[in-house]
Amino acid sequence: MKHETINSITLPKIGFGAWRIGGNSSPDHALDSKSLTALRSALEVGYAHFDTAEKYADGHSEELVGEAVRVSAKKREELFITTKVTPSHLKYDDVLKACENSLRRLKMDYVDLYLIHWPGTGVKYEEAFRALNKLVRDGKVRHLGVSNFKLKLLKQSQE
């Protein structure tokens, strides 16, 4: 697996997207065996970056990613785990709670990258970013960012 270093962070060039792992918008436990097989196989062939979200299968994707990581031969430090907070959880306390819930489902002490999954309507991004920065200071998140933001909104969110 090829890697790239960006600002002192070394990342695999290809990651495993866990959308549909464990279901679609709600958990589908009938898929657990196939989902875990896919995740374990990915780990065995060298995948080290896993991307999930609290929205994927209503958090069940995070549970399965965490389970696959725990039973793998890989050390947590060798992996890069990304998860995302939904737009409905972007108030300060909601961001903190959403991250705690994600960490609980993953059964991990921290995530490498925590993203705002989608822009939200009427969201005060300053409040969301204050919470995200607190998570970084507290060691629960190593890096933060956004997903699915158009450039104009990204610039507005930085104001």
Regions inferred by a protein language model and the residue ranges of each:
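Proline-centered loop/turn at the N-terminus of a beta-strand
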Residues: 78-80, 142-143
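N-terminal binding-site loop/beta-alpha segment at the start of enzyme catalytic domains
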Residues: 1-79, 137
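Active-site mouth loops of central-metabolism enzymes
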Residues: 19-34, 83-93, 120-123
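Glycine/proline-rich, positively charged
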Residues: 89-159
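A cross-family glycoside hydrolase active-site/sugar-binding cleft signature
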Residues: 17, 51-53, 82-84, 114-117, ...
